[in-house]
A protein has these predicted regions:
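Conserved SGNH/GDSL esterase-like catalytic core that processes O-acyl groups on lipids
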Residues: 29-31, 39-125
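Catalytic His-Asp segment of secreted/periplasmic serine-dependent ester chemistry enzymes
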Residues: 157-223
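Charged helix-capping and loop-helix junction motifs
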Residues: 127-136, 165-170
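Second-shell loop/turn segments in exported
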Residues: 40-45, 122-129, 159-162, 198-204
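N-terminal secretory targeting modules
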Residues: 1-33, 37-46, 56-67, 100-104, ...
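Active-site segments of SGNH/GDSL-like serine hydrolases
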Residues: 110-119, 139-169
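Conserved beta-strand segments of alpha/beta enzyme cores
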Residues: 68-70, 149, 181-183
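Residue-level recognition of beta-strand->loop/alpha-helix junctions
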Residues: 71-73, 154, 186-188
Length: 223
């Protein structure tokens, strides 16, 4: 009788362990980094629903969300300011959360930066090179802090950011991502659909554009 009880208890413990492991591996902690694309900046200078928010919704439907941190992103973020945030272990005052800790604990990290920094009429080759140099450092640091899923969005051409410039920049970014085993998600085709933008005067997508970006990320990572 005692043997049966012991076996029953061991079986229950083992089953609980299996169930715990299944649910544990399904839990997701998302950290979003970047500029106005990451925050959901709109033509009306207000923050809307971003692709990160749509990703959060996607994970809520398919997995369990532990945490979603989007406050590290800033609509005027540049590669330089993001790099310094990482190096200086920037702290969110609202929650007293350190960025390195948040990144270390994250299971899914997204980065979208470069549109605010590079899309202006006096863009120089030096600025592009500085951007790529900073992105190299950022990507390297992220891999130091985290060994799980990291997604970097491509740039796309718009007004001052010419198609050929974007192509060269994206090729460099893609190579950096390949070296560090990071997902590089190409969203350059977003500019081929006017329905994805508020109007022709803004580089920021509307909610349809952000849904498109979310879908491209899901396809790249999970398909």
């Amino acid at each position: 009788m005692k043997k049966i009880i012991i076996l029953t208890i061991l079986g229950a413990v083992f089953l609980s362990f299996i169930i715990y492991q299944c649910f544990y591996h399904e839990r997701v902690q998302i950290v979003a980094l970047g500029d106005g694309i990451a925050t959901g900046e709109t033509y009306y200078d207000v923050t809307g629903y971003s692709f990160n928010d749509y990703l959060r919704d996607y994970f809520e439907e398919t997995k369990q969300i532990d945490e979603y941190i989007k406050e590290f992103a800033d609509k005027k973020e540049t590669s330089e300011t993001l790099k310094m945030k990482l190096l200086n272990n920037y702290i969110l005052e609202s929650t007293d959360t350190k960025i390195q800790q948040a990144l270390h604990e994250a299971s899914f990290i997204t980065i979208a930066t470069g549109t605010y920094e590079l899309n202006h009429p006096k863009l120089t080759t030096k600025e592009i090179n500085n951007y790529l140099k900073n992105m190299n450092k950022i990507i390297s640091l992220l891999r130091v802090y985290n060994d799980k899923t990291i997604v970097l969005l491509s740039l796309y051409p718009f007004r001052y950011l010419e198609k050929e410039e974007v192509k060269e920049i994206n090729e460099s970014l893609k190579n950096l991502c390949t070296e560090k085993n990071i997902y590089f998600v190409d969203i350059t085709n977003i500019v081929n659909n006017n329905a994805y933008f508020f109007n022709k005067d803004t580089p920021y997508p509307n909610y349809k554009g952000h849904r498109y970006i979310k879908d491209e990320i899901v396809k790249a990572v999970f398909d």
